[in-house]
């Protein structure tokens, strides 16, 4: 193995050693969401024609799990290394900033997709959701995990203590996730909130992902693809720049 592959393997091993916490726990949480929201809101929330609310909810929960866990992987790894003071050992290696980025974001994609697959496997029994366009599912799943993995890397570099990381997650990631259409179609919202939703990049990730299941979406999947791709490019550029300049990692 070369340098980036070793770091990638280390990051995979890091979350896999506590797999019950990092993989199984989010799956259990998604089951609870499905049981509670699917039961309470079935028939009460307007979604797509001929699509039950429980079936509509499933892709949203899968993508929400992918995004949140991809972010948690890179952000928690970096903040733990900074707080414990062992990040210096990585800095002593000849790894380039690109190798760091690929390893951290790549491992975040693996964790996000693993959790998403687990949520899909378990919750699919609640509603036999079709797979109209599997390629769209894979594309948006991968891009969403990479985007949040990159965002987690930026947050991990910025935060200097766990409180700052918790604030970033509680005031940025969680609100944007819950207001992205996981539990509802934006067409059920008043016009003003529909317009606000279009400024949320998480909405396009979830809407494009959901298109792969039903073949219908609130906006064109091609528009979602372009916007998510643009957001991924911006986040990647910022993350690479911060790593290259040693932002908050070099004394």
Question: What is each stretch, according to the model?
Answer:
Residues 1-135, 139-251:
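Hydrophobic transmembrane alpha-helices and immediately adjacent juxtamembrane helices
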């Amino acid at each position: 193995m070369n340098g980036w592959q070793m770091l990638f393997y280390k990051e995979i091993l890091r979350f896999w050693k506590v797999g019950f916490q990092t993989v199984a726990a989010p799956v259990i949480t998604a089951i609870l969401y499905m049981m509670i929201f699917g039961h309470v809101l079935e028939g009460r929330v307007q979604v797509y024609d001929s699509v039950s609310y429980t079936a509509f909810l499933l892709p949203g929960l899968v993508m929400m799990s992918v995004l949140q866990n991809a972010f948690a992987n890179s952000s928690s790894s970096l903040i733990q290394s900074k707080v414990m003071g062992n990040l210096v050992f990585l800095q002593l290696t000849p790894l380039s900033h690109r190798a760091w980025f690929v390893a951290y974001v790549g491992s975040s994609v693996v964790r996000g997709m693993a959790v998403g697959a687990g949520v899909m496997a378990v919750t699919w029994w609640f509603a036999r959701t079709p797979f109209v366009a599997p390629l769209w599912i894979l594309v948006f799943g991968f891009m969403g995990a990479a985007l949040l993995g990159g965002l987690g890397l930026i947050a991990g570099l910025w935060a200097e203590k766990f409180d700052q990381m918790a604030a970033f997650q509680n005031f940025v990631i969680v609100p944007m996730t819950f207001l992205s259409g996981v539990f509802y179609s934006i067409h059920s919202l008043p016009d003003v909130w529909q317009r606000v939703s279009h400024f949320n990049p998480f909405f396009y990730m979830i809407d494009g992902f959901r298109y792969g299941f039903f073949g219908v979406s609130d906006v064109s999947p091609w528009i979602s693809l372009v916007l998510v791709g643009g957001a991924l490019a911006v986040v990647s550029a910022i993350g690479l720049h911060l790593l290259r300049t040693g932002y908050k990692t070099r004394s």
